[in-house]
Amino acid sequence: MTDPVTFTSPRPRSQFVAILVYTLQSCLPPRRLAAVLMPCAGALLFGLLARAVDNFPTAERAFANVAAEGIFALVMPIAALVIGDAVLGAEVRSGTFHFTWLTPVPIWQIVLGRWLGGSFVALVTIAPAAALAAVIAGASSTAGAAYLAAAVGSVSYVALFIAIGCITRRTAVWSLAVVFLIERLLGAALTGIAQLSPTWESRAIFVGYLDDPPDRLIREGIPQGGGAVVRLLIVTVVALAVANWRMGHMRLSGAAD
């Protein structure tokens, strides 16, 4: 007599893992990823530009000046905005976020899963592009600093844009206003705003780990290197906390007009 055959069903995914996988599969389709890669290609062009600049004593200084204005102030926030809007804002506008919001999943898991999914995409696209730009510029010694600065800055931006997506349906418009009006214009004049800006703090991370940084990139009142990393981690946690609170009070409706 043979023993009865028993069949075991595969262990179901946890709710958090399901949110994370859904974020990567559904919220970041190929067209969105292509939109992320376009500014990343721009980062490589900035690397070529730094290589062509000949009015700096070293390639490292040339790349530092170009990266500060081109990569950390333009490429990184735009690419992170595409990611941040994809993981939440676009679904809210289309009316499909209802299906996630109405599930018996804790709000904090939805927020954290969306942020981790977006951060993963940023870490494999934006940050490597910044490091590769340093190599293209002939400043390979700064590639590690460029990767770290772009990585920390982009994941902080993703958290910020998720929070904005929980506050308003016009995520892209308000996010651009935050980046270019508040961070770039007001942040250039007011150190208090720059201290909370992913753009300015990512530049400070990059500059802090350079052996011979240009004096014009060192700004008083903003921590450099590891201090800037800690500051952006705090900004990220606060942004996620705001997103968690606001998502619990969202009033969802149909697709935006």
Regions found by a protein language model. Give the residues of each.
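Aromatic- and glycine-rich beta-strand/loop motifs that create alpha-glucan
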Residues: 2-38
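Alpha-helical membrane-protein architecture signal
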Residues: 13-21, 108, 112-116, 144
